[in-house]
């Protein structure tokens, strides 16, 4: 095997591999002999077809199938012999059988960027200090009280706090919008789920009343169908129900769960759950801040194909989130081209961060052990009610173990960095603040 390596760019190498005729021709002959025993051509008995006819009819097929095998069998040996460290699958750009009987293929591969690792220990990170206010607990209990309330139909105009059943149809420039229509829609007046302007129009309306209402929605409205648009609504009230709220006493707490004997126990449980959720959210924030701090000062080039792959994964995630709301990219006013443009810098930083973490893992000899894998399998099993064996079988059947191991390795490296970091307490924040930061970073 003859191997030549050429530098195409700082991070791309062209690997030219030539296999001698002595290695190639016996395999070609073996392929033809196998076909000779199997194929059936009119005018010849099976196994008696002349070799020249076999070659004439099947040359392209044999060479195509064999070239794929020859590349697969020799590519990894070639890059290993040359000491290359590919970080992407090869792009096979040239495959040819030479006149002397040899075989040549050219592979373009992306290699790991070379950079100096700076300081990664003792990073100063602000640790979110979480706290649960009594007002938050009272608000949650009030929401429980509201949900548990009995609903009674009333013959009067609707007021805040009522539940109104309404049919509505939205129009834009006189055309009915199929996605802005609902029958028997339950509107909780004052909750704000339908928007203040929409709910304000229903206040004062009674069963059987109809009304027209125009609303201009802001550009930052969460519903991508109506954001930034002026919509004309036709409303029809079907009925009005008022809530009969239960007293907030020990009996209410008992109705909330068998484990509660008093209102104090219910409040203690809510506080513990909220603190746990805040702490979990804070962990994500700390990891994000660690990565941000770690990346400061690094601008080394990363392989464009890895950035493109990361961008594709981000777009898939966006598509999945939209699908959960019954939307497509087009319906949301987005396109893959636009998202690629918006995501490229974030994707490059993620790829850069991954290279940084892997270099730290090499220096610190951090590896994924069997017990790390088992913990990872158990964590997923707990989420989806599966056994460790079932989770393991799932990953093996999909050939997804390597991405999973990479995720576990990154978690382990981040845990190491956190153990070496200097944590500075931040002011106490509410759950929404911590969760918002974790989602945005």
Curated annotation (Swiss-Prot):
Residues 161-246 form the PPIase FKBP-type domain. It is found in: Cytoplasm. InterPro entries: PPIase_dom_sf, PPIase_FKBP_dom, Trig_fac, Trigger_fac_C, Trigger_fac_C_sf, Trigger_fac_ribosome-bd_bac, Trigger_fac_ribosome-bd_sf, Trigger_fact/SurA_dom_sf. Gene3D superfamilies: 3.10.50.40, Trigger factor ribosome-binding domain (3.30.70.1050), Trigger factor, C-terminal domain (1.10.3120.10). GO terms for cellular component: cytoplasm. Its EC number is 5.2.1.8. GO terms for biological process: 'de novo' cotranslational protein folding; cell division; chaperone-mediated protein folding; protein transport; protein unfolding. Its main location: cytoplasm. It catalyses: [protein]-peptidylproline (omega=180) = [protein]-peptidylproline (omega=0). GO terms for molecular function: peptidyl-prolyl cis-trans isomerase activity; protein folding chaperone; ribosome binding. Keywords: Cell cycle, Cell division, Chaperone, Cytoplasm, Isomerase, Rotamase. It is an enzyme of class 5 (isomerase). PANTHER family: TRIGGER FACTOR CHAPERONE AND PEPTIDYL-PROLYL CIS/TRANS ISOMERASE, TRIGGER FACTOR-LIKE PROTEIN TIG, CHLOROPLASTIC. HAMAP family: Trigger_factor_Tig (MF_00303). Involved in protein export. Acts as a chaperone by maintaining the newly synthesized protein in an open conformation. Functions as a peptidyl-prolyl cis-trans isomerase. Consists of 3 domains; the N-terminus binds the ribosome, the middle domain has PPIase activity, while the C-terminus has intrinsic chaperone activity on its own. Belongs to the FKBP-type PPIase family. Tig subfamily. This is Trigger factor. It comes from Desulfotalea psychrophila (strain LSv54 / DSM 12343).
């Amino acid at each position: 095997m003859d191997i030549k390596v050429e530098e195409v760019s700082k991070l791309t190498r062209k690997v030219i591999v030539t296999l001698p005729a002595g290695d190639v021709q016996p395999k070609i002959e073996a392929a033809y002999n196998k076909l000779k025993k199997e194929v059936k051509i009119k005018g010849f008995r099976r196994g008696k077809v002349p070799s020249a006819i076999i070659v004439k009819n099947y040359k392209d097929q044999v060479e195509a199938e064999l070239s794929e095998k020859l590349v697969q069998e020799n590519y990894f040996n070639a890059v290993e012999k040359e000491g290359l460290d590919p970080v992407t699958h090869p792009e096979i750009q040239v495959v040819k059988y030479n006149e002397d009987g040899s075989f040549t293929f050219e592979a373009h591969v992306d290699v790991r960027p070379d950079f100096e690792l700076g300081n990664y220990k003792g990073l100063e990170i602000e640790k979110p200090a979480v706290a649960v206010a009594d007002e938050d607990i009272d608000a949650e209990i009030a929401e429980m009280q509201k949900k548990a309330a009995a609903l009674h139909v009333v013959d009067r105009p609707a007021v805040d706090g009522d539940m109104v059943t309404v049919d509505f149809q939205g129009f834009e420039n006189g055309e009915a919008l199929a996605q802005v229509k609902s029958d028997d829609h339950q509107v909780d007046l004052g909750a704000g789920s339908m928007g203040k302007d929409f709910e304000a129009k229903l206040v004062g309306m009674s069963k059987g009343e109809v009304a027209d209402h125009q609303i201009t929605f802001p550009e930052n409205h969460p519903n991508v169908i109506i954001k930034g648009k002026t919509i004309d609504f036709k409303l029809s009230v079907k009925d009005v129900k008022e809530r009969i709220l239960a007293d907030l006493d020990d009996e209410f707490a008992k109705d909330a769960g068998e484990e509660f004997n008093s209102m104090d126990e219910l409040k203690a449980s809510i506080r513990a759950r909220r603190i746990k959720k805040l702490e979990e959210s804070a962990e994500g924030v700390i990891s994000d801040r660690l990565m941000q701090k770690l990346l400061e000062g690094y601008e080394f080039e990363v392989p464009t194909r890895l950035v493109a792959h990361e961008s594709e994964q981000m777009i898939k995630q966006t598509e999945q989130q939209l699908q959960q709301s019954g939307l497509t990219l087009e319906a949301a006013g987005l396109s893959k081209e636009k998202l690629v443009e918006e995501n490229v810098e974030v994707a490059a930083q993620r790829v850069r961060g991954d290279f940084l973490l892997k270099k730290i893992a090499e220096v610190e000899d951090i590896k994924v052990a069997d017990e790390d894998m088992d913990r990872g399998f158990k964590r997923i099993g707990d989420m989806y009610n599966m056994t460790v064996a079932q989770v393991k079988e799932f990953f093996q059947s999909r050939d997804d173990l390597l991405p999973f191991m990479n995720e576990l390795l990154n978690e382990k490296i981040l845990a190491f960095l956190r153990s070496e970091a200097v944590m500075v307490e931040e002011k106490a924040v509410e759950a929404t603040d911590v969760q918002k930061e974790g989602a945005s970073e």
